[in-house]
Amino acid sequence: MSNEKNLPYAVVCGGVNIDIGAHSFAPLRAKDSNPGKVELSLGGVGRNIAHNMRLLGVPTYLLTAVGGDSRASQVEESCKELGIDLSHALRVPDGRTSTYVFVGDSDGDMAVAVADMEICEKLTPDYFASQKELLDGAAAVVAVSYTHLRAHETDQYL
């Protein structure tokens, strides 16, 4: 595998999320609407690492999973703008793209969060084994711990 300029490249194995953060302007009142602001951003440990590698000028592939929903389109468009290559990402047509929702209190501390990351379970050893050629050609591979690439198993999949 090589990129269009035949430069050394990195592969990041990990998740990508749509992060939705809500911050209350006043102390939170349980079981009530709280005035505040809501912001949407892209996150996920794998995506964040890939983003920073691109900022350093490193051609980077992200091995991740996205669903067949509108959130996947947001992920793909953002990664394209950043130069993160998703051409080898796992697409799960009936899956939900990972989404993380958190509510922060008026002091900026997280009060509660919900993580819909079930799609990360699709990042299996078989999926990574199917990417062997890409992984073998990489100058560097970064694997986030929940991606089933445990240290004692790595040689079997990479």
Show the residue positions of the predicted features:
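Conserved small/polar residues in nucleotide/adenosyl-binding loops
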Residues: 147-154
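A glycine-rich helix N-cap at a beta->alpha junction
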Residues: 83-93
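Conserved phosphate-binding/catalytic loop of the ribokinase/pfkB sugar-kinase fold
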Residues: 91-92, 102-140, 145
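Structural motif
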Residues: 63-65, 89, 144
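Cationic, low-complexity basic patches in intrinsically disordered or flexible, solvent-exposed regions
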Residues: 157
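Glycine-rich phosphate/adenosyl-contacting loop at the front of the ribokinase-like
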Residues: 1-65, 70-74, 80-84
